C-alpha cells in the first residue's frame, strides 16, 4: 500500500431544504389557512478517526466532499427530511488544519473520535410561519440556508512511543525487525527505508510499546535534503528517541560527528524534538573488538561530556545488547505513560495507534490475505521475557 501522510481537501455541508408554500384544502374547507412545512437540515460533514486506516492515500483520488441537502418542506405542515451526515474517515493521529490560515482545528488521537467540520444549513420556514392578523394567506416561504464550506489540510502523524533516528544504513530497520514482528525492507545500501515502519515491542506479557522507524537523515535534512525531513513529524509524539550510530570500523568517518550532525538536524526541525529524552545506540558492534569499542566510547565521553545520553552497545546480527535495551526503553515508556496518565500498554490501545498494520496483524485471522507484504509470511511475534 502506498504511504501518503498529507492531503488537501474541500468540504461543503448540505444546504437546508426550502420551506413550502401550501394551503389547507379539504372537503368543505375550500379556503383553509397556510400549512406549508419547513425544509429539512442539510447534512453535516464529520471527520471520524478510524484505527484501521494507516494512510491518506484515498484523498489523492478524491478531494471534494459534499454532503446532501435537506428535503424541501411539504404541505400539511410536513417538515422535510434532514440529510444524513457525511462521515469522512481518517487515520488516528491525523491533524486537521484550516487551509486559509493554518489553524489547527482538531488532533484526532482516539479511535472513533469525531469532529464536526462543517455544519449543515438549516431548513427554510414554510408559509405557515408567516400568517398574521393582516395576512391570512401568506405566499412566502424561506429558502434553505446554505451549508458551510472550507478547504482543510490533513496531516497524519503516527502514534508511536519510541522513534528510531540516525543516518542511512545505521541499522534502524534491522533493529525494529529484531525486537518486533515488523518486517521492513533491509539491504546493504543507503535509503532502503522509504516510508515509516511501525512495530509492537512486547516486554513480558503485561507491557508493550510501539516503535517507529523513519527513513535515514542526512546533513541539511531540516532544510529539505534527503527523505527523513518529510517524516520527522511522525516521531514528534514519541516519548523516547533512539539515536543509532554505526561503529563498524574505526577507519570510517568520525561517529561522534555523525551523532552531532543528526542532533543538529533534529534541533533545526523543532525544539520539541531536541528536548526529547534519547538513548545513544552504538550499532553493528559485532564488527569491533572490545578494545575498539572502548575507544569509541571514550571519543563520545570526551566530546559530549555531561550532554552525553545513556549509551547502549549492541549488535542486531548477534543479538548482543538488545534485551537490555528493550527493558530499559520499556521502563522509560512506562514512566512516561504514568506521568501522562496513560495506563496500560500498546496492544490495549492498538486501535488508537494510527491503525498500523503492525498492530492489526497481531489479532488478524489466520486466513487473512497478506498480498501487500512479500517478506512477512514467516513473521512471528517477539515477546521479551527475563529469565
Swiss-Prot record:
Coiled coil: none annotated. SUPFAM superfamilies: Obg GTP-binding protein N-terminal domain, P-loop containing nucleoside triphosphate hydrolases. It is found in: Cytoplasm. GO terms for biological process: ribosome biogenesis. GO terms for cellular component: cytoplasm. Belongs to the TRAFAC class OBG-HflX-like GTPase superfamily. OBG GTPase family. This is GTPase Obg. The gene is obg.
Amino acid at each position: 500500500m502506498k504511504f501518503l501522510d498529507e492531503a488537501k481537501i474541500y468540504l461543503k455541508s448540505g444546504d437546508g431544504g426550502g420551506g413550502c408554500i401550501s394551503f389547507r384544502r379539504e372537503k368543505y374547507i375550500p379556503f383553509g389557512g397556510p400549512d406549508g412545512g419547513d425544509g429539512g437540515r442539510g447534512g453535516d460533514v464529520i471527520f471520524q478517526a478510524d484505527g484501521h486506516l494507516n494512510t491518506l492515500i484515498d484523498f489523492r483520488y478524491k478531494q471534494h466532499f459534499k454532503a446532501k441537502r435537506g428535503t424541501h418542506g411539504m404541505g400539511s405542515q410536513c417538515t422535510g427530511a434532514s440529510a444524513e451526515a457525511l462521515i469522512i474517515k481518517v487515520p488516528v493521529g491525523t491533524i486537521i488544519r484550516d487551509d486559509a490560515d493554518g489553524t489547527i482545528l482538531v488532533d484526532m488521537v482516539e479511535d472513533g473520535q469525531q469532529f464536526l467540520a462543517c455544519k449543515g444549513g438549516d431548513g427554510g420556514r414554510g408559509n405557515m410561519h408567516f400568517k398574521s392578523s393582516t395576512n391570512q394567506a401568506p405566499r412566502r416561504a424561506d429558502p434553505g440556508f446554505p451549508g458551510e464550506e472550507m478547504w482543510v489540510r490533513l496531516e497524519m502523524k503516527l502514534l508511536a512511543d519510541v522513534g528510531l533516528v540516525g543516518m542511512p544504513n545505521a541499522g534502524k530497520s534491522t533493529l525494529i525487525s529484531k525486537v518486533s514482528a515488523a518486517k521492513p525492507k533491509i539491504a546493504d545500501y543507503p535509503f532502503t527505508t522509504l516510508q515509516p515502519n511501525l512495530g509492537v515491542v512486547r516486554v513480558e506479557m503485561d507491557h508493550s510499546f510501539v516503535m517507529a522507524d523513519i527513513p535515514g537523515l542526512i546533513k541539511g535534512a531540516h532544510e529539505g535534503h534527503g527523505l527523513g525531513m518529510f517524516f520527522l513529524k511522525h516521531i514528534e509524539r514519541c516519548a523516547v528517541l533512539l539515536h543509532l550510530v554505526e561503529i563498524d570500523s574505526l577507519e570510517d568517518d568520525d561517529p561522534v560527528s555523525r551523532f552531532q550532525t543528526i542532533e543538529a538536524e533534529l534541533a533545526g526541525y523543532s525544539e520539541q524534538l531536541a528536548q526529547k529524552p534519547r538513548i545513544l545506540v552504538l550499532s553493528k558492534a559485532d564488527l569491533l573488538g572490545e578494545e575498539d569499542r572502548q575507544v569509541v566510547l571514550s571519543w563520545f565521553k570526551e566530546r559530549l561530556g555531561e550532554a552525553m545520553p545513556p549509551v547502549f552497545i549492541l549488535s542486531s546480527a548477534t543479538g548482543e545488547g538488545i534485551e537490555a535495551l528493550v527493558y530499559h526503553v520499556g521502563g522509560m515508556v512506562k514512566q512516561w505513560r504514568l506521568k501522562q496518565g496513560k495506563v496500560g500498554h500498546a496492544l490495549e490501545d492498538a486501535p488508537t495507534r494510527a491503525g498500523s498494520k503492525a498492530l492489526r496483524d497481531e489479532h488478524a485471522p489466520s486466513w487473512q490475505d497478506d498480498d501487500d507484504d512479500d517478506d512477512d509470511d514467516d513473521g512471528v511475534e517477539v515477546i521479551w521475557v527475563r529469565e
